[in-house]
Amino acid sequence: YYDMNFIYEIDEGAWLGEKIHAQAGTPGTNVHGEVVVAQRGRDIPLKYDRKSAYEIEEDGKTVIRSKISGVLEDYKGMVGVNHHLPVNGDVGVETGNIDFNGSISIRGTVQAGFSVIAKGDISIDGPEGVSGAKLIKSIDGDVFIRGGIFGLGETRVEAGGSIFVKHVNEANLVAGGDVNIGFYSLGSNIRAHSILVDE
């Protein structure tokens, strides 16, 4: 249950939808046996985010394709693709591990044994922080953990950029930039360009 693949990532150029153009209808007959002339269909424009998608004519249809890679987004009735993945709760049994080619914001926590990997920034906004998570890794960005890290000797946090955390307890942190700790670090291994503790 750790790898549930609940995220369906979309590649650049992927099919998002299509429209068949309005055509003339087929004439019918009413109850009196009289011919009823069909009206031509109305052509309705497609609604999509023009920053993340485009339309193209293919095989007599208007097809919407993605300009960027990311996750499918429905915003006010418009289809689009977003580089940002919001998780409105915890990463745990409901979501499985997350591996995303963009940035991630998590409103809750990352539960024990689960992992989050992102190409961009990772923000974990739950006040309780992280307890026993396996891996939190931002390949090119920063990691922001609003609460602290209770690593239980298991948690590893990696960032291509910097790591920002309230406190660290029994965890391993590796950053290409700085590690910024709000209060304290206890029983942890930390490697970074510089380590800043604000007491």
Residue spans of the language-model regions?
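Long, low-complexity, mixed-charge
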Residues: 1-90, 95
